[in-house]
Amino acid sequence: MWLSTSPYRKGSQCGEAFSQIPGHNLNKKTPPGVKPPESHVCGEVGVGYPSTERHIRDRLGRKPCEYQECRQKAYTCKPCGNAFRFHHSFHIHERPHSGENLYEC
């Protein structure tokens, strides 16, 4: 038997109680009397997780990963020059160059 350790949550619009629904799925609107999230960078209202990181990154002009080793593309296709970060992507790409038949009739 599964027991919930968290208290029941109430929907902000309907008032129903839920025991196994995450808070972000209850109701999408902010309940009355509760201030919506605000960006600490620009002051824009309504910025909430999971878009918070992306919003702040956009406002500050940062890229998702600023480390060179994260952006490095280690696998380069010799016939066409395309580069790939992952071996699996490279392997799929090089199949047509090798003349390998992917599917049998």
Curated annotation (Swiss-Prot):
Xref: InterPro entries: Znf_C2H2_sf, Znf_C2H2_type
Record bears the keyword Transit peptide: no
Stretches annotated zinc finger (C2H2-type): 75-97
PROSITE patterns xref list: ZINC_FINGER_C2H2_1 (PS00028), ZINC_FINGER_C2H2_2 (PS50157)
Keyword Zinc: yes
A single GO molecular function term of this UniProt record: zinc ion binding
Keywords, alphabetical: Metal-binding, Zinc, Zinc-finger
Protein name, entry field: Putative zinc finger protein 861
Gene symbol of the encoding locus: ZNF861P
